[in-house]
Curated annotation (Swiss-Prot):
InterPro entries documented for this protein: SDH (IPR005631), SDH_sf (IPR036714), SdhE_FAD_assembly_factor (IPR050531)
Entries under SUPFAM superfamilies matching the protein: YgfY-like (SSF109910)
Keyword tags: Chaperone, Cytoplasm
Record localization: Cytoplasm
Family under the similarity heading: Belongs to the SdhE FAD assembly factor family.
Primary location class: cytoplasm
Single Gene Ontology BP annotation: succinate metabolic process
Protein name: FAD assembly factor SdhE
Pfam families linked to this entry: Sdh5 (PF03937)
Function of the molecule: An FAD assembly protein, which accelerates covalent attachment of the cofactor into other proteins. Plays an essential role in the assembly of succinate dehydrogenase (SDH, respiratory complex II), an enzyme complex that is a component of both the tricarboxylic acid cycle and the electron transport chain, and which couples the oxidation of succinate to fumarate with the reduction of ubiquinone (coenzyme Q) to ubiquinol. Required for flavinylation (covalent attachment of FAD) of the flavoprotein subunit SdhA of SDH and other flavinylated proteins as well.
A GO CC term attached to the entry: cytoplasm
Top-rank lineage group of the source organism: Bacteria
């Protein structure tokens, strides 16, 4: 039995903002399986955030107060080559 319900995670990757869909889903499809279990757990916690929080974090308008979540945001930005300059 798989530890992670991938259908549920994929569903949670679908967001209400196109900008987030273009960041989160491609990351999930391409990189989720490469993550350690700890990082997978953090990614799943990240998905519980609101679209407004995610937008703020991914587009450098704020930072998560949770350092693990913030590190995951920065990792995704780096891997997805997101720049907001």
């Amino acid at each position: 039995m798989e530890k992670y319900n991938k259908l549920r995670i994929e569903w949670d990757c679908r967001r209400g903002m196109l900008e987030l869909d273009k960041i989160i889903m491609p990351f999930y499809l391409k990189h989720f399986d490469e993550l350690t279990d700890d990082k997978k757990d953090i990614f799943i916690r990240l998905l519980a955030s609101t679209d407004l929080q995610l937008f703020s974090w991914f587009f450098n308008r704020g930072k998560s107060s949770d350092s693990e979540i913030q590190s995951m945001v920065e990792y995704i930005q780096n891997v997805q080559k997101i720049t907001t300059n």
